[in-house]
Regions:
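Short, intrinsically disordered C-terminal tails of secreted or membrane-associated proteins
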Residues: 160-164
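Short, solvent-exposed secondary-structure boundary motifs
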Residues: 8-10, 79-81, 165
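Phosphate-binding site of ATP-dependent enzymes
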Residues: 1-76, 92-95, 100
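Serine residues within intrinsically disordered or low-complexity segments
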Residues: 147, 165-166
Length: 166
């Protein structure tokens, strides 16, 4: 269960989610209001409506401040300079030029990969960077077969789109 303070801004405009892979903004989505009385649904479960869009400069700056704070904390606690594979920062405008931080998702984040044309490719690239970066650090190097795109590299690992797991 997550408990958040009620904000009229959420009912009026919804939220903006900024999705990061390996510390780099991948994409942003706008989540439409869901619980406002004007939201009509006949289902008991409300479908979340998300639309990909470019974040405003202020949204980007706010999200980047949050991401940097998380990265700094990880460095201080772990002693390692490492970015999270993924995280999501949800913000809502406060109507005065600032933002409310609504949620930071670090573990089970909804990444809205289907809402953004580049989202899935960016996530696959982030995973490939981790896998091949780790292999290079362990002396394995990077595979040379293929065109260099993510799908070709994943295919070498047996994880490409044409593989079926049993």
């Amino acid at each position: 269960v997550m408990v958040q303070r009620y904000l009229e801004e959420v009912d009026r405009k919804g939220e903006v989610s900024l999705v990061y892979f390996n510390g780099v903004l991948s994409h942003a989505v706008e989540k439409a209001p869901m619980l406002h009385p004007s939201f009509k649904s006949t289902d008991e479960i409300h479908e979340e409506i998300v639309t990909a869009r470019e974040p405003s400069e202020q949204e980007w700056l706010w999200g980047e401040r949050v991401r940097k704070a998380i990265h700094t904390l990880i460095k201080e606690v772990s002693g390692r300079d490492i970015q999270l594979l993924f995280n999501r920062v949800d913000v809502v405008g406060d109507g005065r030029g600032g933002f409310y931080l609504m949620e930071v998702s670090l573990i089970d984040a909804g990444l809205y990969l289907g809402a953004s044309p580049e989202g899935l490719d960016n996530f696959a690239d982030a995973i490939a960077q981790r896998v091949f970066g780790w292999a290079a650090r362990c002396g394995g190097g990077r595979p040379t077969r293929g065109s260099g795109d993510t799908m070709a590299r994943l295919e070498l690992l047996g994880a490409g789109p044409n593989r079926v797991s049993s």
